[in-house]
């Protein structure tokens, strides 16, 4: 039979140009697409042979082979699947966006659709060959038919079909003539790596045929996540984890589930037992891989998990996900949101279970990934309360990790707030003047030292109807709490319990003096309810930004300047008493002024806020040192 020439269907030139130059950003996926098509062909025949065994013609073991001829610049892929006749070649390869797999699915009943393992849903995967090849030849022989046909094209608007002889009983053989600029694909290491990366879990075995004719199976041809959990050992899970995550540690938790309903998908996810070095790198890729029917699609630009769970490793495999025409970039699909919501719920449930099961191990997890998980508190999602429930925080009173539920269980009568303080150093927070009065009344304070803590506390204000309140707020309601009497110790350390407070007149006079000396350097001066050992501290008005958060945002260039603060004073402290005494006696007023200015600068230092005039501060310190020496 002579060669017959055909024109591709309408607009084919534009579509081919799109496929070759625009549609696929990753050239190496041409082999993934061809292998997926070959796998489909094998699955089609496997299904049809159930009702017509003669189609197998005595060859029931399916396989895919890949070989190359470097000298002739050929890459050859062959399968022993269903094959195609002349009509199939015209329909499937002569028409862009017409997929034989899609048509096959349309012909199946609903029950049969659930059982088949066909991958291709679009008619352009085959044409990705032209990204790296300047000519493609296809020899195919359909199962149950005697005649073989050759289809060939350079991808320039025409294709050719002719009768031919085939040296195989059925299936399809594709030969790509590789363009000179893509010589890198004429390397058996490269070819094997592509197969291993994208098609490792396809059920049909894939063999690389060397120049000596020997076949070497490249893929594992087994997807662990498709098996029942009861059939998988811990060792098999560990081996899979190390392979999929490129990790050397053991997984701390394995989450293996199959979802059915609105969307069907399987997840096999792992929580590592150690933290990776790039966990907080802004360009870090997701380590959860998306598969469709056991074919690797991507681990980029797909929100299968929320960013605050980026410590997860593993795979998600679905047959329902909608891809755009290239299979490269996922469409904006509500199915992705459903998968993410389902996975998020499972992970939170699993973490809650682990927290109850072994607090010690959970604390190890928290030290590794707690800061990442708390990023979810910044997003204002419906999962905030669930996330807060599994969070751990360092307790100032108990000097250990506790949950918010544990904090609430130990609340004092009439206490309505959950108190916290943010900062960079745990030991510095423990000795902060801000928490003295609370601790002296046995009211606990949560010590928050992660950078993310400075952000989530601004958007997450409540937990179980209790207000999360910064201790740097001026309005700390601790007087009505049913607790032990607060102890105020001065710097004399004489062992005496000095709890007497100055009368109203003395306090008014003292505050007036501080305001006169400090002027607009502070927003206000107030008598403190929370200081017991320290003379002064800085606070902010109710509703204002936390002092430490403000400092962090200024360091990150998100704010330009510090806001005006309130200076709280402790009338029972020795220094404040001395200042008050000098005021009453109208003596040492110059020293008094120096003391007030120095106390303000000290409060700046404690909160990490820069001193406005460092040289003036040093001069004052030297002045007091000289007086002490003399």
Curated annotation (Swiss-Prot):
Molecular function in Gene Ontology: ATP binding; ATP hydrolysis activity; ATP-dependent protein folding chaperone; unfolded protein binding
Pfam family of the protein (one): HATPase_c_3
Location of region: A: 1-327
Protein name: Chaperone protein HtpG
Function of the protein: Molecular chaperone. Has ATPase activity.
Region: Disordered, residue numbers: 483-504
Chain segments carrying region C: 552-630
Biased composition (Basic and acidic residues): 483-499
Gene: htpG
Main localisation: cytoplasm
Subcellular location per the Swiss-Prot or TrEMBL entry: Cytoplasm
């Amino acid at each position: 039979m002579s060669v017959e020439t055909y024109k591709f269907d309408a607009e084919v030139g534009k579509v081919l140009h799109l496929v070759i130059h625009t549609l696929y950003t990753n050239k190496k996926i041409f082999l993934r697409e061809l292998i997926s098509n070959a796998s489909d062909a094998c699955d089609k025949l496997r299904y049809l042979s159930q009702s017509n065994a003669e189609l197998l013609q005595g060859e029931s073991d399916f396989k895919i082979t890949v070989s190359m001829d470097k000298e002739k610049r050929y890459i050859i892929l062959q399968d022993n699947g269903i094959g195609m006749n002349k009509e199939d070649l015209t329909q499937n390869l002569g028409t862009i966006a017409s997929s034989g797999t899609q048509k096959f699915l349309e012909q199946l009943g609903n029950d049969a659709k659930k059982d088949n393992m066909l991958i291709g849903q679009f008619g352009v995967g085959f044409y990705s060959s032209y990204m790296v090849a300047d000519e493609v030849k296809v020899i195919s022989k359909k199962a149950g038919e005697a005649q073989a046909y050759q289809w060939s094209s350079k991808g320039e608007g025409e294709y050719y079909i002719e009768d031919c002889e085939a040296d195989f009983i059925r299936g399809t053989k594709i030969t790509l003539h590789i363009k000179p600029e893509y010589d890198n694909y004429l390397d058996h290491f490269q070819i094997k790596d592509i197969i291993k990366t994208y098609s490792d879990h396809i059920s049909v075995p894939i063999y690389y045929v060397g120049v000596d004719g020997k076949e070497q199976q490249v893929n594992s041809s087994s997807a662990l996540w498709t098996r029942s959990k009861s059939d998988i050992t811990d060792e098999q899970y560990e081996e899979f984890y190390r392979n999929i995550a490129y990790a050397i540690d053991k997984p701390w938790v394995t989450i293996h589930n199959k979802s059915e309903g609105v969307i069907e998908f399987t997840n096999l996810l792992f929580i590592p037992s150690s933290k990776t070095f790039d966990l907080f790198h802004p360009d870090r890729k997701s380590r959860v891989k998306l598969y469709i029917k056991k074919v690797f699609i991507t681990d980029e630009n797909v929100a299968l998990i929320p960013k605050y769970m980026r410590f997860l490793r593993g795979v998600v495999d679905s047959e329902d996900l909608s891809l755009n025409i290239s299979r490269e970039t996922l469409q904006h699909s509500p199915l992705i949101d459903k998968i993410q919501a389902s996975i998020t719920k499972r992970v939170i449930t699993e973490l809650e279970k682990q927290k109850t099961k072994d607090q010690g191990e959970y604390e190890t997890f928290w030290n590794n990934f707690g800061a990442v998980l708390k990023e979810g508190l910044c997003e204002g999602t419906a999962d905030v309360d669930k996330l807060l429930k599994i969070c751990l925080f360092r307790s100032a009173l108990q000097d250990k990790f506790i949950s918010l539920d544990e904090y609430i269980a130990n609340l004092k009568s009439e206490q309505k707030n959950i108190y916290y303080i943010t900062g960079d150093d745990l030991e510095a927070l423990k000795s902060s003047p801000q928490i003295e009065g609370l601790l002296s009344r046995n009211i606990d304070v949560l010590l928050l030292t992660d950078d993310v803590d400075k952000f989530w506390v601004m958007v997450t204000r409540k937990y179980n109807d209790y207000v999360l309140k910064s201790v740097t707020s001026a309005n700390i309601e601790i007087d009505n709490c049913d607790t032990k009497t607060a102890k105020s110790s001065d710097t004399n350390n004489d062992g005496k319990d000095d709890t007497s407070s100055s009368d109203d007149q003395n306090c008014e006079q003292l505050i007036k003096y501080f305001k006169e000396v400090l002027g607009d350097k502070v927003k206000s001066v107030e008598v403190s309810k929370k200081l017991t050992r320290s003379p002064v501290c800085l606070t902010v008005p109710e509703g204002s930004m936390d002092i430490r958060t403000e400092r962090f945002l200024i360091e990150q260039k998100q704010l330009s300047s510090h806001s005006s603060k309130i200076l709280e004073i402790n009338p029972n402290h020795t220094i404040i008493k001395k200042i008050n005494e000098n005021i009453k006696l109208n003596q040492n007023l110059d020293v008094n002024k120096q003391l007030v200015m120095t106390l303000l600068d000290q409060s700046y230092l404690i909160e990490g806020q820069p001193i406005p005039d460092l040289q003036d501060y040093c001069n004052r310190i030297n002045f007091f040192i000289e007086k002490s020496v003399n």
